[in-house]
Regions:
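Proline-aspartate-enriched helix->loop->beta-strand connector
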Residues: 68-73, 77-100
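Active-site environment of divalent metal-dependent phosphoester hydrolases
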Residues: 5-8, 22, 57-61, 78-83, ...
Length: 129
């Protein structure tokens, strides 16, 4: 699917959300993930909307999402988001449940602390080891 495409496959509505880097770059200012080829997806299952972000940062397209029940956001430096970027994205589109993933050595409790006042966002941490 191309950035922005929407398809229905076997009863599931799938929306392609551009996934790319804005801040984190390779040497020479080349993004780890340039805009264009990569997507995250919003998948609608009956009345539930799930966002799986892919390898991305807190892009304007992500921050404009609406009515997300569950979000999976990457938190892996230098390729994706810092805990602060994940918190910024979550505060913008307000998923009911947030699972950080891909976080490797980043302490997920940093994200929990950043969102502790966001009472309508439940952060769920799973052991990645």
């Amino acid at each position: 699917m191309q950035n922005g495409d929407v398809r229905t496959i076997q009863g599931l509505k799938i929306e392609a959300v551009p996934a790319y880097n804005i801040v984190h770059m390779r040497s020479g200012r080349t993004p780890f993930h340039p805009k264009g080829p990569g997507n995250g997806y919003v998948i609608t299952f009956a009345d539930k909307r799930v966002h799986v972000a892919g390898d991305t940062e807190n892009t304007p397209e992500m921050k404009r999402l609406k009515n997300i029940d569950i979000a999976f956001l990457p938190m892996n430096l230098p390729y994706t988001m810092t805990p602060q970027m994940v918190a910024d994205a979550a505060k913008a589109f307000k998923p009911k449940i947030l699972y950080p993933y891909h976080y490797g050595q980043t302490d997920p409790n940093m994200l929990v602390n950043l969102l502790k006042r966001s009472k309508n966002i439940e952060v769920r941490i799973r052991n990645m080891r």
